[in-house]
Regions:
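Basic, amphipathic DNA-recognition helix from helix-turn-helix-like DNA-binding domains
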Residues: 1-64, 141, 170
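Generic detector of well-ordered alpha-helical packing
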Residues: 16-19, 29-30, 72, 96-98, ...
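Positively charged, aromatic-enriched patches within helix-turn-helix-type DNA-binding elements
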Residues: 81-151, 155-158
Length: 170
């Protein structure tokens, strides 16, 4: 009845093979006892965010704003520069996922932790400086580092926001 509802297995079995079998059986996440309640709640919230994000309707399969067009299905990115020339930009999987996440929620500031959980993985153990590096590279590729009106705005101490009107369409 709810095929897009995430499944989290909560079990006492913690062996590696049990986890593999559970995930291969269709679980979206696997939590073994003993567990911390706060961690379980965080995992549930992360899974629901990903599930809800998948339900966002984009009938054309395209995200458009600030001189950028993302073809979500074909995973292609096009940028219109100041001269009106439309060029395809090659993005890595992570860069595409990051830009897509930001463009799906234009004008909304996304927290660093939320971005890390949704683009990388909720179990990411590295530094959020990785996000800064990818954002910087992405800005360079979409010509955002030369534009006085930034398309990807840094919200100090919080995260990032995509500004869909930052660049007048040519």
């Amino acid at each position: 009845e709810h095929p897009d509802l995430p499944i989290i297995m909560l079990t006492a079995r913690a062996e590696e093979m049990d986890v593999i079998v559970g995930l291969n059986a269709g679980a979206d996440d696997y939590v073994a006892k003993p567990f911390r309640l706060a961690e379980l709640v965080a995992r549930i919230r992360a899974r629901l965010r990903v599930s809800e994000q998948g339900r966002v309707a984009h009938p054309s399969g395209r995200l458009v704003g600030a001189g950028i067009e993302l073809d979500v299905e074909a995973r292609r990115c096009f940028v219109t520069d100041r001269t009106g020339t439309r060029v395809e930009i090659e993005l890595t999987t992570t860069e595409f996922d990051l830009l897509s996440l930001l463009m799906r929620q234009p004008g909304v500031t996304l927290k660093r932790e939320q971005i890390m959980a949704e683009v990388w993985d909720e179990n990411w153990w590295g530094s959020t400086r990785t996000l800064d590096t990818h954002t910087s590279t992405l800005r360079r590729k979409i010509l955002d580092d030369t534009d006085p009106l930034s398309k990807i705005v840094t919200v100090r101490g919080v995260g990032f926001r995509f500004e869909p009107t930052a660049h007048a369409e040519a």
